[in-house]
């Protein structure tokens, strides 16, 4: 009976030993598995962490490069535009002479000018030497009687002549002005018609409504020929030969110019001097007073 008890005790001891040995194994396995897993997880987690900054840095490097490239392109385009604008300005800019400084007397300047010239265009000065031909407006006007007469008539026609009386009712007619100038090369007892620019003032006999309703065409009142036109002259000036010879007497010349009167008159010039033509009766008068005193110059006419 004792033998089976030994066997039972042995089996019980073996079972106890096994029971004692099994928990440590289980604990060790349970402890070892977490110790191995964190390392693997850390490695797995560190790898994406190490990889993500790399991708971010690569993207950050690409973005500044693109921005720098775009800035360079914009700067290049701006430079090209500025260069194009500079070239266009240089092509279009023309120096406008505002200040002319001469180192020669007046007699030499009447022919040509080759001295120092100061010009200004926009904001930068240009100093260089030029040679150019002076126009007639730069010359001294009081040289002889012919140029004096032409100058005075030019001023009168340029400032006070209205349109031809034969076409005074129209608004679209091309405005021509006549000045009868004496010239040595012209024929005797003939008139020279010169077209000047438009005057600063235009005088009409009728109001605007009547001119608009009267029609576009009108009949000419000329009865003496096609060479004579009726015009309105303001500040009619008569200069005799004595006054022409003493033209430098400024006071007397200014007194003549200050006389202002409005009248329908035609100034003609022949080899005998200036003549005043009445457009109503067609007579010629030597003086302006005779023209005013004759019957056609009344207020009704």
Swiss-Prot record:
Biased segments, Polar residues type: 44-60
Tissue: Expressed in a variety of fetal tissues.
Chain residue ranges for the region called Disordered: 1-77
Protein name according to UniProt: CPX chromosomal region candidate gene 1 protein
